[in-house]
Amino acid sequence: MAANGIVIVDKPQGWTSQDVTAKLRGVFHQKRIGHGGTLDPMATGVLPVFVGRATRAVEFFESAEKGYEAGLCLGRVTNTQDTTGETLEEHPVTVSRADVEAILSQFTGEIDQIPPMYSAVKINGQKLYQLARQGKEIERKPRRITIHSLRLLEGEELRLEVLCSKGTYIRTLCHDIGTALGCGGCMSSLRRTRAGCFTLADSIPLETLIAAEHPEQYLRPVDSLFADLPAVTLTAEQVKPCRNGAAIA
């Protein structure tokens, strides 16, 4: 029987999201596989993967909120807005944790964010990262995003906890925070802790899936996608009109 369902992968560092889906095609012996939100290679964490007929449900997941923990590196500006990129500027860091905490409110709520050149955003049919690799930089229009919550986590290192809308670039958020502080900044690490109703507690390490004799045991039913939504129980008389798209009183 062909595999169908949703598996929540804890993506390892160094893998692209497409690498993960390509690997799982072999694991589940299923060609129809897609993921619910790209993670950069340096990032780890929650990557929902839709298998078989469940791929039809991806469209219902695309607007899901995302949660992240990100490392903030101050004093360094790079071309990719993270520590994997080429250093463009370096500045002394004289700001304190209190200074960082005080500025976070500027980046909470609905804000405009300019997508980075190293991204898959298309302008005039070309992906920005393709232009960036050619040494080109073009004007990008700001996009409206929502940062639902943003706080600095405890610890010696600067780590941000972010809950945000679809389309938010955490790399750019780190870059913009550094700019606002006057010393520049970039992202040093990224872990997705939540995607929609799925969290790290739901995720399975990729190596576990690869090694599993029966990987289908980790598949969730498609209706798990809607676990955090209010439910309505239909009467027998309401089922048919509902299937036909009619309003239910």
Tell what function each PLM region has:
Residues L24-Q30, P48, E137-G182:
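The conserved catalytic core of RNA pseudouridine synthases
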Residues G85-V95, M117-S119, E137, E161:
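Flexible, glycine/proline-enriched loop segments at strand-loop-helix junctions
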